[in-house]
Amino acid sequence: MTKSLEEFKKLVDAEEYFKFFELDYDAKIVNVNRLHILKKFSQLISEIDTNYPDISAEEKLNQYSLALQSAYQVFLGSSPQEQKLFKVFKDKPKNVITLTELSSD
């Protein structure tokens, strides 16, 4: 069965993407990091679409498959807090006072 971009665009869940590309994955890793994997995957897809606008649909799907593998691999070795993909991990809490701010001059 040949996969198409139209089929790809209908996918919603992380597991659907892995099955579509016939990639092995650990369900525990995906369950814990689902949103982060999909966010990273989305960023990588955007880069592919921007950098390679004229590649064939088949090559685009190949690149997307590599992007999903890459997004998944990131979270095998690091945490969402380390990756800081979402705003909540980027913003410094406003109600925190550092020790250097407490020291007297």
From Swiss-Prot:
InterPro entries: NifW (IPR004893). Pfam families: NifW (PF03206). The keyword Lyase does not apply. One of its GO terms (biological process) is nitrogen fixation. Coiled coil: none annotated. The keyword NADP does not apply. It comes from the Bacteria. Keywords: Nitrogen fixation. Belongs to the NifW family. Homotrimer; associates with NifD. May protect the nitrogenase Fe-Mo protein from oxidative damage. This is Nitrogenase-stabilizing/protective protein NifW. It comes from Nostoc sp. (strain PCC 7120 / SAG 25.82 / UTEX 2576). The gene is nifW.
